[in-house]
Curated annotation (Swiss-Prot):
Residues 159-323 form the OBG-type G domain. Monomer. Its EC number is 3.6.5.-. CDD domains: Obg (cd01898). GO terms for molecular function: GTP binding; GTPase activity; magnesium ion binding. Residues 1-158 form the Obg domain. Mg(2+) binds at residues 172, 192. This is GTPase Obg. The keyword Zinc does not apply. It is found in: Cytoplasm. Residues 121-143 are annotated as: Disordered. GO terms for cellular component: cytoplasm.
Amino acid sequence: MFIDSAKIYVKAGDGGKGCVSFRHEKFVPKGGPDGGDGGTGGSIFVKADANLATLLDFRYQRHYKAERGEHGQGSRKTGRSAKDVIIKVPVGTIVKDSETGEPLADLVYAGQEVLIAKGGHGGKGNQHFATPTNRAPRYSEPAGVGEERNIDLELKLLADIGLVGFPNAGKSTLISTISAARPKIANYPFTTLEPNLGIVRYAEYQSFVVADIPGIIEGASEGKGLGLKFLKHIERTKVLAILIPADTEDVQAEYDTLIEELRKFDESLCLKPRIVVLSKMDLVLEDASFEVPAFEGEKVVQISSVTGTGLQELKDVLWRIIQESNQQEESIT
C-alpha cells in the first residue's frame, strides 16, 4: 500500500527545574547557594531516510514525545539533558504545521534533518541569583516548556521522469520493461492505484528514476478519477513523458486533453521538459492510414513494449534531456 499523507502529534521535552540548594560543609555554617541548573528537554527532528518509501508507519504510531531534562542538584550539579527524538521519513516528504499550514521542512535528499519541535531550556539554579543584598536566594528559574504541535506529513515522489497518460496507456508495461519495477499489470483502467518507481540502468554507473503515475482522466485536475491525489507527484519530476497508445481513436485529442489537465492543475508543469511517447506501435504497423501527429513540435518517440522497438532510443532521449535539465539547474544555483 502506498501511503502519501499522514498526521502526527509531537511534543518536545520540558527542561529540568533549577535547584534551590545551599552548601553544607563542615566548619562552613552559612554556605552560599549551590543549586545546579536543569537539563535541556529533548527536541524532535525529522530526517529523510532513503530506505523508506511510504508513510505507512505513521498509521500505527501517531504520537511522538521526547523526555524532559533532569532537574538540577545541589553542589552545582547540572541535570542531564534528554535525548533528542529522530523521526525518519521517506525522501520527498514535506512537513507542515497542521494549524497554521506553515512549511517546516522539505526533505529532498537522504540524511537531511530538520528541527520541528524544540526542547525546553533547563531552569537556572539559585547559584545564579546571589547578590550583595540577597546572598541566600531561595528561588530558581522555571524550566522552559518543550514545543508541541500537530504535524502534516505529505510525500511527493522524487523521480527524474514522470510517465503521464490515460488509464491503460501502457505505463506499467513500459516501466516493467525498461526497469526492475514490477507493477501490477492488467488490461483494464486504473490498474495502477499507487505510484510506482523504477530505476532504469542506462549505462555502467549511470541510471535514472521513472515514476509511473496512476492514470489521468479528463477532469483529474478537479479531483475526478484518482485526481489530485496523484497529480501532485508530477510536480517533483524533472521531465514529463506523455504516453499515448498509437491505437487510440484520436491520438491528438488525447494529447490535448492530457496537456490541458496538467495546465489546469499547475501551469508550471507545462514548462517542464517533455516528450511524447507513442506506445503500442506494434498494433498499428499494418495500418496504412496511421499518421504521427505533429504534437506542437514535441519530440516523439515511437515504441512497443511488447517487441522492444524504440526502447533504446527512448532511454537515449530521456537520458539526454535529464542531463540538460541537470545542467540548467546547476547554472541557476
